[in-house]
Amino acid sequence: MIIIKIGGSAITDKSRPLSLDLEPVRGLARLLRRLGEGLVLIHGGGSFAHPIAKAYGLGGGTRDEHQLIGVSLTTAALEALNQALTIELAREGVATYYIRTGDVFQARRGQASLANPGPILDAVKRGVAPMLHGDVVMDSELGFSIISGDAIAEEVTRLLRPRLVLFLMDVEGVYSEGAGRGALMRRLRRGDLIGVGGDTIDVTGGLMGKLRHAWNIAEMGTRTFMCSIKDLESIEAIIGGNDPPRCTELIP
């Protein structure tokens, strides 16, 4: 069993709302079809969700009726993205089953909780890849809040205990001087980040959150990598149990 989290930046251009690049998805789907291993697929929202969520101020929960319109529009945009990905994967022979994130996840002050694992387990038993995405879900204290695909990957790992989790991005892994700059860090431990912003590794914002979830997964005993979605050579090597020519492995 493998969990693959496809970052929104790997398949959309966040500077252009509702933009979608399906070519990387096609290449990945062909590889996954050929390798034939059990999967769970999770994707981010990218330019489909982020502009709407930002415009309606959903990052800190919901406080008024205007924001509830933002919840509606964000979930609709994410389902449109999911539908496009589902169709493209099916064309390449990868069967997925869409599980609406809000039907299985809840949150408390923005912290994800897998409240109803049944649909995920049932899909896996039937041999189809569950597909989820980062989304706006009901929050016991904030009304609605956003949970990331990375948080979902951590919780589903806790449920299924896969042998491998891949975070696929628009860059080849974590770099010593920020996105695409400096040396590619082939292995990364939590302690390597003590000097963030100084002379060690410069990671901030969304990547820092992604790393936190990735390390939590690695500490469960699951090998965890960050790779470019376009680096099919490395992805195939990792799935085959070999060392990839690129990518960053998270070490607990």
Regions found by a protein language model. Name each.
Residues 2-252:
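C-terminal catalytic "cap/lid" subdomain
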